[in-house]
């Protein structure tokens, strides 16, 4: 991998997650340190694809390659949503994503992190993004505002990185609004994690009906949550699982 932080584990903190995203933005804008890392900035290139989508076990070494936008179990990192913001807001894929999107790339977890204080990242393919903390507007930015920094990406249909400065830290909710033609069309919120309360089990189907004959394998996620249902990203809790049946 190339760039500031090409590899990041899912359990690393929110700043490290952002560093992987920022490295990919630098490659698109021509600030990568290899010639081919000028994908959108190079007028001869009309598109790009990502290697690798997921983290994977390396055949030559024991260490896992953590360069994916999802982990080995296909659970999304922040960079997954960064890549999702590059698609046109008019494009939908039933069961996977719907048109306009916005994502707050922060856990709002600590005043020690720039991603919860002075550089709160938001990914969106909308015309304008507004960010609120506990109901108060932090700021709003448009695609047009970002053309100086991300002009090459925007000109080819992609989306910029929106960074908001809250001036400090406050526990609670960060809420982003995606605006198209002056109307809020999509929102995303994150809350400061509190004490562990319960385990939520998620079985993503991806529109696949699994058959218990050994031919299908799907991930099952056990997520440690607080009383509000907020995922506790840095939980070190041990979970015992008993499975029965054939």
Map each language-model feature to its residues:
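Beta-strand-rich structural segments
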Residues: 120-124, 215-232
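Extended substrate-binding grooves/exosites of carbohydrate-active enzymes
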Residues: 1-169, 173-183
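Short, solvent-exposed loop/linker segments at the N-terminal edge
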Residues: 109-116, 207-218
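Extracellular Ig-like/FN3 beta-sandwich strand-entry sites
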Residues: 169-173, 215-217, 236
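Edge beta-strands of extracellular beta-sandwich domains
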Residues: 182-194
